[in-house]
Amino acid sequence: KNNLKIEARTDKNNKRYYFIRIAEPIQAKKISFGIGRDYSGLRVITVSEISFYNYDSLEDDIMGLYEDELHTVLKGSVTEQTIQDLRNRLQTKDEASGEYHPDKDRLEKELDNAEDILNNQLSEPILVHNTITTRDTDRGFSGLNAWQPLGITAAAGEEITLFVGHNTMGTGSNTNLQLVATQYHAESGSVSKVVTTLKTGRNDVTIPKIWSTDEESGGALYIQYTGNNANDRYSVRVNGGVEVPTLDLYGVTDAQERQQRAEQYVEALKGYVEKMEAVHKKVHENSGNESVEYEYSKENCILGATDILLDKMLFSLPAQQVLSGCEGNAQKLLDSMDAMEGMMNLFYQHKGLNQTAPDEKDRFPQRHLNIRYQRMFA
């Protein structure tokens, strides 16, 4: 039983059938099918046709293009010719049956996904934390969200492409991930918008304009997990926008790893902030996108958006101010973050919450308090 995967499918005539996949090729003289029915006896299952297919390594070869099980990173040896050779095999009918591969449509999507990844300049994969979710229990206070930074800032009207991978779902499947667009240096009523619910594989998205203020429009992008499954493993890569340094310390308890991540982040910030005005002139002033065709302003340029993700807090701040505040010192930054986490512990304990409480509503929230760089009320 553990070596079988049974999928209920529907053909082009809306007739249901079942696709049975055996984990590994077998040699057999006899195969037995046991077909039952429910206890009511009203629904009789009948079988009009059974098709058997010879083993073909094509599916394994296509899945073998990827470095990771989430299908967002290709192996270094993959070329356009590698993908084309597999596509040619997929377009060839089986000699014995005279039919194409029974999973031809799904495998074509996998090849399209691999080709897209190969031909695009993508950001590094972001692994989604499945313990930060919108399905968190309501505890009677607001100000929390389930946003996870993608390390990308994008202008309103800009078209970007996101590639989503999952540990079990095939390309084109619906996910529990939403893309959230935000406005940098926003007013209180125009901070964010859920743009779309993503599918596995390629997602082409246009970033919406969130406000009408005569300043640059756009900001940091986030993923929001809406599920509640500990086995969900998602990875996201982005083509488009501008990569911005971010620091993810969520769930990181090892002191050495925290130090290393903080040092890498601060070094990345130094190089990024130094070049920010030049990048603005290149990708904003000369972009042809009126949403960002403004003279450089360090207060309003959306390139300034950086995020620091902690266990209970998400900081969304100007990159220049983070660098200035820590004076380019990773240890000073870590000390500040540790102090904030300690304050959040006291804050939640004051509300009667306890991380080890038996009832979820009495535990610390899974969502984050988000401190953002925003405009003061007029």
Locations of the language-model features?
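Exposed low-complexity, polar/acidic, P/S/T/G-rich flexible segments that act as propeptides
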Residues: 40-58, 227-298, 303
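Beta-rich interaction/scaffold domains
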Residues: 57-119
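Aromatic, loop-rich ligand-recognition surfaces of beta-strand-rich domains
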Residues: 1-2, 12-57
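Extracellular carbohydrate recognition and processing domains
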Residues: 2-22, 190-208
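Catalytic cores of extracellular degradative/oxidative enzymes
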Residues: 282-378
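Beta-strand secondary-structure signal
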Residues: 19, 32, 161-163, 222, ...
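Beta-strand-enriched, solvent-exposed domains that form extended recognition/catalytic surfaces
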Residues: 116-258
